[in-house]
Structures are given as structure tokens and as C-alpha cells.
């Protein structure tokens, strides 16, 4: 492949958001170094202007590209939630050590911007105890990014995502699981009360948020956070009922709300304050109803 003069690094490029982001970057004509655990598998599905590499090879590749190409930014999507491991070392490595390696590369090769991906349940005003190691490590790296932004000529951006959904998400995720239950015509799905308010954000809008910040990187402060969501909340119950009614009009509800006890310190309300993101020229194109309809079209 022929690389353009400017490129970005994307970690977690083979994941849910990463795949959508790569397609959008391709359409924008931006070259990408895409970090993945399985280079051979992803090279077989190569996109134009995308060069796949492993975490072990990223430094050598960036050094090679520095001869005639400029690194303009890094988008860090890769993460470890801790669902499949109880090892704090593994979680710390994925959420702090590896992105710090990328941040050092960004400083060394004078990238303009580092976009870090974070989650709504790690907001500082929440005391969410579920996935605590994930939350601790994400907050740790955010502090490191803030420190680096004060010490170096780079913008560090914390992209705090609300509840992202869309085509291509993992089968074990909440919404794909519910869709699978509906497809299998299960008679009962046990839920909590469903009173939690969430800001469901369609993956296309999330990708556009990253592109908007990347395109306007010269206007971004040295450190800032953008909350990526529609700015409007809906209860889990209303979201699930609309999903079922759209998939199976006229069917009886399969949801048994209140059958599962709420977690301690459950987050009952999370909606993005997206004013500063909108000020950069971004706006969501999908409310939750349009998002559900678009998701079902693309399954």
C-alpha cells in the first residue's frame, strides 16, 4: 500500500468501534496504522491506506514511517474491562502501560493529538463498584494524560462514551444479547426494574465525534474531555420495549422487569453533557428510536 504524508495510529482497530472508524477514515482519505492482536487475520481483510501491526512492532513501524510520513494523532480504543481476567496486571497493562507506550510515541514523533477512549461508568461523580479495576486504571491513565498535556506540546483528549450500540457489536454485549433472545422467541428475559436512564449513542455518531475532533485538532485545548452521547436519556425499560416492538410488532412483552436485584451503587442516571463537543461542529444524527431502526436494518 501507498501511505499518504499524514497518518494516525488506531489501537483496538479490529474491535466494534475500531472497524467502523477504519471505514470512516478510509473514506476520509486518512492513512492508518492499525494495532491488533492478530495481524495475519486482519491483513487478509486489508483496507486501502491501512497498515496492520502488533503492539510489539509499533515502535519500529512508526520509526520507519517517520522518514517520509507524519504522525498527526493517535486514537486509543483498545481496552480491558476485566470480564475474562481477574489479573490486575493484565488490566493495568492494557489500560495504562500500552497506551502510555503510545503516548510516548506521540510525544517523540510530535503528533498533534492523543484521543483516549473512556466510559460513562468511570465518571468521577459515580461510585460504581462493578468492574472496579477497569475504572481505577482508566482514571489512572486519564491523570497521566493530563500530566503529559501540561508537560508537552500535545493535546490529550478523553473521549467519554455513553452507551454505544450498533451493527457489529460483540454477541456478549447487552443489546446483541437482547436481540438474540428476541430472535429465538424466548418467552421470558429477566431484568432489573429498567428504571436506569441511559444515553444510547449509535456507533456512527461516535465515529463522527472522533473524526470531528481529529479534523479540528488545532483548536483543541491541551487537555479536555468530550462526553460523547446524544444529550438525551431514556430508561432501559423504554429502550427495550421499543426494540421489541420494532422487531416484533404486536408481540407480548418478554421482559420481566424487577426480576433481578439492582447492583449496589448502580448508576441510575447518565446522560452526556455534549455542549463542548457540539461547539466543535459535531451533532448526533440518531436518537434512540432512529438508532434501533438503523441497527435492525443493518443486521
Curated annotation (Swiss-Prot):
Question: In what pathway does it function?
Answer: Bacterial outer membrane biogenesis; LPS O-antigen biosynthesis
Name of this chain's protein: CDP-abequose synthase
Q: Matching Pfam families, A to Z? A: Epimerase (PF01370)
The family classification in the record reads: Belongs to the NAD(P)-dependent epimerase/dehydratase family.
Q: Which InterPro entries match?
A: Epimerase_deHydtase (IPR001509), Lipid_A_modif_metabolic_enz (IPR050177), NAD(P)-bd_dom_sf (IPR036291)
| Misc remark | The functional difference between abequose synthase and paratose synthase lies in the side of the pyranose ring from which the keto group on carbon 4 is attacked in the reduction of CDP-4-keto-3,6-dideoxy-D-glucose.
Catalytic machinery residues = 134
Alphabetically sorted, this entry's keywords are: Lipopolysaccharide biosynthesis, NADP, Oxidoreductase
Q: Which reaction does it catalyse?
A: CDP-alpha-D-abequose + NADP(+) = CDP-4-dehydro-3,6-dideoxy-alpha-D-glucose + NADPH + H(+)
Cystine pairs: none
A GO MF term:
oxidoreductase activity
Which Gene Ontology terms describe the biological processes this protein takes part in? O antigen biosynthetic process
Per UniProt, substrate binds at 117
Query: SUPFAM superfamilies under this entry?
Result: NAD(P)-binding Rossmann-fold domains
Cleavable signal peptide: none
Per UniProt, the enzyme's principal EC class comes to oxidoreductase
**The enzyme's E.C. designation:** 1.1.1.341
State the gene name recorded for this protein: rfbJ
Amino acid at each position: 500500500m501507498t501511505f499518504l504524508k499524514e497518518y494516525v495510529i488506531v489501537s483496538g482497530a479490529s474491535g466494534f468501534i475500531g472497524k467502523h472508524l477504519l471505514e470512516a477514515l478510509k473514506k476520509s482519505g486518512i492513512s492508518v496504522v492499525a494495532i491488533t492482536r492478530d495481524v495475519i487475520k486482519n491483513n487478509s481483510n486489508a483496507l486501502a491506506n491501512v497498515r496492520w501491526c502488533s503492539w510489539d512492532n509499533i515502535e519500529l513501524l512508526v520509526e520507519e514511517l517517520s522518514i517520509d510520513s507524519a504522525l498527526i494523532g493517535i486514537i486509543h480504543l483498545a481496552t480491558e474491562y476485566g470480564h475474562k481476567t481477574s489479573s490486575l496486571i493484565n488490566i493495568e497493562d492494557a489500560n495504562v502501560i500500552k497506551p502510555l507506550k503510545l503516548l510516548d510515541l506521540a510525544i517523540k514523533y510530535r503528533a498533534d493529538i492523543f484521543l483516549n477512549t473512556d466510559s460513562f461508568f468511570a465518571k468521577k461523580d459515580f461510585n460504581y463498584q462493578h468492574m472496579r479495576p477497569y475504572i481505577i486504571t482508566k482514571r489512572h491513565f486519564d491523570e497521566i494524560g493530563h500530566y503529559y498535556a501540561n508537560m508537552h506540546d500535545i493535546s490529550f483528549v478523553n473521549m467519554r462514551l455513553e452507551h454505544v450500540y450498533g451493527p457489529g457489536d460483540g454477541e456478549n454485549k447487552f443489546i446483541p444479547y437482547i436481540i438474540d433472545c428476541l430472535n429465538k422467541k424466548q418467552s421470558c428475559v429477566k431484568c432489573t426494574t429498567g428504571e436506569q436512564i441511559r444515553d444510547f449513542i449509535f456507533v456512527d455518531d461516535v465515529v463522527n465525534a472522533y473524526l470531528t475532533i481529529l479534523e479540528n485538532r488545532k483548536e483543541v485545548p491541551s487537555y479536555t474531555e468530550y462526553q460523547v452521547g446524544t444529550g438525551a436519556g431514556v430508561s432501559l425499560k423504554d429502550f427495550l420495549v421499543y426494540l421489541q416492538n420494532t422487531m416484533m410488532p404486536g408481540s407480548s412483552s418478554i421482559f420481566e422487569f424487577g426480576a433481578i436485584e439492582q447492583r449496589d451503587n448502580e448508576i441510575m442516571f447518565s446522560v452526556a453533557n455534549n455542549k463542548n463537543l457540539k461547539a466543535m461542529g459535531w451533532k448526533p444524527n440518531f436518537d434512540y428510536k432512529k438508532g434501533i431502526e438503523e441497527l435492525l436494518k443493518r443486521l
